[in-house]
C-alpha cells in the first residue's frame, strides 16, 4: 500500500561518465563477447575486402591505359590490351565486393541478435529488480519514470548498441586501411588528402563534445514527460474533479519544453555530421584531382593511381562521418544505459534466502495471534510517524483501526505485512517475529482488499484465483455468490471466462466486489481491509459487509475504515492519532468513555440517530 505514483520525482542527474557506463554495459554483455568478437572480426574482414578493391581497380585501369599507346583516326587502338589480365582482375573485384557484402550481412545479423538478447535480458533484470526494491523507492520515483527505463531506455540500448559497435570497428578498419593504401600508392597525394580531412575532424570532435550532455538531458526529459502523462492518465478523474486541467497542461508544457530543448539541440548537432563530412569528402575529391593531375603530367604517377585515390578519398572520409554517427549513438546508448544501470543498482531489500519459513509449515496452520510491541517507524530518518505502538490481537479477533488522515493507520498494516521495515520494536505472528522469516512467508498469511482496486488482463476466473494454484471453479463461484457478484458475472458474454483488463466496463463497486472475492478465495488466516467499502453505495456496502462478516469468522482481521458503521461489531477498536494509540476498546466502551472516538462517531451519526 504505497503512497502513490506522485510520491516524488527523480532529481536531475549529472552528466554521465561515458567510459564507466560503457564498461558496465560490456561487463553485462560478457556472455555474448565471443559472438560479438566474431561479428566484429567478420565486419573488419569485409572492410578489408572493400579496401583492396580500389587497388585492384587501379591495376585494371593501368592495364587498359597500357593498351592505348596511340590514337588512330581519332579512335583508341585496343589491340594491345591484355583482356585476360583485365578479366582476371575484374573477377577478383567481383569476389572482393561479394565477400564484403556477405560478411557485412552476417555481421549485422549477429550483432542484431546479440543486442536484442541484451535488451531482453535488461528487461528481465528490471522485472526481477522491481520485485526486490523496497516500497520506499516508489515513494520517491514516479511509476512513469520506471516505465520509461523499461521501454524507452532499453529500446535505445537495443537500437544503438549493435549498429554503433559494428560501425565503430568497420570505420576504424576502413580509416586505417584506406590510409595505409593511400601511403602505399603516393605519399604526396595522401598528405594532401589528410590535410583536407583534418579540418572536418577538428570540427567533428568539437560537435561531439557539445552534444553529449544534450543526449543525457534528452533521456532525462523523456522520463519526466512519461511520468507526468502516466500520472495524469491514472488520475484523470481527480484532475477533472478539481479543475486541475490548467495546472496539468502547464506542467506538461514545461516537461515537453525541456524535452524539446534538449532534443532539438542533440539532434541538430548530430545532424551536422553528415553534411560536414560530405563537404570534406567533396573538398578532398577536388584536391586529389588537382594534385593527381599535376603529378601525372609530371610523370610521377600512373593514371590508375588517380582513379584509386578518388575512391580512397571517399573511403578515408566516410569513416569520419560513420565514426561520428557511431559515437553519437554510443553516447545515446550510454545515457540510456546509465539510467537502466542506475535503476538496477538501487539498494535492494535484504536477502532472506537463509531464513526459514516458520509460518504455516510442517503441518502447523497459522492461528492468527498478532503482537505489536513498541513499534517505531518513519519513512525518512529522523522523522518518525509511528512513535510507540503496542497492541495484542488474539486469533479470530476483528480489529478496527480508526483515526484522522495521516494518523498512521495504513502504515501500521504496511508494517504488519513487512512492506516496510520497522525502526524499532517487534511484530510477531503466532509468537514468530516477522523479521525472522522471509517476506513471502509473511505475505502468505494475508488476504487483502485495498482501497485501490486492481484488475489485470485475464478472465474473471484468473482474476479471482490470482496467484492461488489449485482453486476450483466451485470455490470461485461460491466466493462470487457470497459477495453478490455471481449474477452479474453470468450476465457477461462469456460468463466467468470473460476477459477483463483495467479498462473493462466494470463499476468501481463491481471491481471492489471482485477483489473481495479474490480475498475469499485466498483463504488466508489474516484479513486486511483497507477502506474496503469506501467506493460503493450503501446497498452494495451492506452486501459486502454481510459477506465480510462471514469471511472474518475464525480469522484475524484488520479493518481500516472512515465509515464507523462498518466496525461497530469489532472486537477491538484502536484509535490512532499522530502515530500513537490514544484509545482502545470496543465500540460501546469507547462511546461510554466520551473521548476522541465518541466525538468522531457522533459527528458522523448525530443526524441519523
What are these regions (language model features)?
Residues 20-21, 29, 111-112, 131-175, ...:
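Juxtamembrane loop-to-helix connectors within ABC transporter transmembrane domains
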Residues 23-26, 34-59, 93, 108-112, ...:
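Alpha-helical segments in transporter systems
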Residues 31, 135-136, 152-161, 165, ...:
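An intracellular "coupling" helix at the cytosolic face of ABC transporter transmembrane type-1 domains
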Residues 31, 35-48, 163-217, 288-301, ...:
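Transmembrane helices of ABC transporter permease
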Residues 36-103, 183-188, 299-303:
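Transmembrane helix-loop-helix hairpins at lipid-water interfaces of multipass membrane proteins
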Residues 358-609:
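ABC-type nucleotide-binding domain
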Amino acid at each position: 500500500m504505497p503512497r502513490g505514483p506522485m510520491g516524488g520525482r527523480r532529481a536531475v542527474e549529472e552528466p554521465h561518465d561515458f567510459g564507466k557506463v560503457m564498461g558496465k554495459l560490456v561487463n553485462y554483455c560478457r556472455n555474448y563477447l565471443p559472438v560479438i568478437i566474431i561479428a566484429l572480426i567478420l565486419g573488419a574482414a569485409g572492410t578489408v575486402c572493400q579496401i583492396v578493391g580500389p587497388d585492384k581497380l587501379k591495376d585494371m585501369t593501368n592495364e587498359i591505359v597500357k593498351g592505348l599507346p596511340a590514337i588512330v583516326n581519332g579512335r583508341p587502338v585496343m589491340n594491345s590490351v591484355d583482356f585476360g589480365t583485365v578479366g582476371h582482375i575484374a573477377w577478383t573485384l567481383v569476389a572482393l565486393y561479394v565477400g564484403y557484402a556477405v560478411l557485412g550481412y552476417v555481421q549485422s545479423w549477429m550483432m542484431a541478435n546479440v543486442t536484442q538478447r541484451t535488451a531482453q535480458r535488461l528487461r528481465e533484470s528490471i522485472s526481477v529488480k522491481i520485485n526486490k526494491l523496497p516500497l520506499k523507492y516508489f515513494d520517491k520515483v514516479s511509476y512513469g519514470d520506471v516505465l520509461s527505463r523499461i521501454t524507452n531506455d532499453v529500446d535505445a540500448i537495443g537500437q544503438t548498441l549493435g549498429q554503433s559497435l559494428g560501425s565503430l570497428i568497420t570505420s576504424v578498419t576502413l580509416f586505417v586501411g584506406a590510409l595505409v593504401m593511400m601511403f602505399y600508392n603516393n605519399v604526396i597525394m595522401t598528405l594532401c588528402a589528410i590535410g583536407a580531412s583534418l579540418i572536418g575532424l577538428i570540427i567533428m570532435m568539437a560537435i561531439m563534445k557539445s552534444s553529449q550532455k544534450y543526449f543525457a538531458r534528452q533521456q532525462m526529459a523523456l522520463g519526466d514527460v512519461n511520468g507526468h502523462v502516466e500520472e495524469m492518465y491514472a488520475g484523470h478523474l481527480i484532475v477533472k474533479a478539481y479543475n486541475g486541467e490548467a495546472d496539468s497542461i502547464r506542467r506538461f508544457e514545461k516537461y515537453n519544453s525541456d524535452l524539446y530543448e534538449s532534443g532539438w539541440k542533440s539532434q541538430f548537432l548530430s545532424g551536422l555530421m553528415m553534411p560536414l563530412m560530405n563537404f570534406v569528402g567533396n573538398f578532398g575529391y577536388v584536391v586529389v584531382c588537382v594534385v593527381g593531375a599535376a603529378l601525372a603530367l609530371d610523370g610521377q604517377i600512373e593514371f590508375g593511381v588517380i582513379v584509386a585515390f578518388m575512391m580512397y578519398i571517399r573511403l578515408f572520409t566516410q569513416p569520419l562521418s560513420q565514426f561520428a554517427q557511431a559515437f553519437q549513438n554510443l553516447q545515446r546508448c550510454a545515457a540510456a544505459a546509465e539510467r537502466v544501470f542506475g535503476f538496477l543498482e538501487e539498494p535492494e531489500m535484504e536477502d532472506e534466502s537463509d531464513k526459514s519459513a516458520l509460518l504455516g509449515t510442517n503441518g502447523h496452520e497459522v492461528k492468527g495471534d498478532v503482537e505489536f510491541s513498541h513499534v517505531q517507524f518513519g519513512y525518512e530518518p529522523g522523522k518518525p510517524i509511528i512513535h510507540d505502538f503496542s497492541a495484542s490481537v488474539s486469533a479470530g479477533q476483528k480489529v478496527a483501526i480508526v483515526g484522522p488522515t495521516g494518523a498512521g493507520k495504513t502504515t501500521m498494516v504496511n508494517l504488519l505485512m513487512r512492506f516496510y521495515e520497522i525502526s524499532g520494536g517487534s511484530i510477531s505472528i503466532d509468537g514468530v517475529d516477522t523479521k525472522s522469516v522471509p517476506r513471502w512467508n509473511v505475505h502468505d498469511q494475508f488476504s487483502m482488499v485495498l482501497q485501490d482496486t486492481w484488475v489485470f488482463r485475464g478472465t474473471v476466473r484468473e482474476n479471482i484465483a490470482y496467484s492461488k494454484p489449485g482453486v476450483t471453479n466451485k470455490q470461485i463461484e461460491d466466493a462470487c455468490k457470497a459477495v453478490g457478484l455471481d449474477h452479474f458475472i453470468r450476465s457477461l458474454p462469456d460468463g466467468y471466462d470473460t476477459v477483463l483488463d483495467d479498462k473493462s466496463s466494470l463499476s468501481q463497486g463491481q471491481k471492489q466486489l471482485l477483489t473481495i472475492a479474490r480475498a475469499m478465495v485466498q483463504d488466508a488466516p489474516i484479513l486486511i481491509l483497507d477502506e474496503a467499502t469506501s467506493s460503493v453505495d450503501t446497498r452494495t456496502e451492506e452486501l459486502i459487509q454481510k459477506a465480510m462478516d462471514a469471511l472474518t469468522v475464525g480469522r484475524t482481521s484488520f479493518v481500516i475504515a472512515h465509515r464507523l458503521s462498518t466496525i461497530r461489531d469489532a472486537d477491538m477498536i484502536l484509535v490512532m492519532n499522530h502515530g500513537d494509540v490514544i484509545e482502545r476498546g470496543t465500540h460501546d466502551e469507547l462511546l461510554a468513555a466520551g473521548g476522541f472516538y465518541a466525538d468522531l462517531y457522533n459527528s458522523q451519526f448525530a443526524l441519523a440517530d
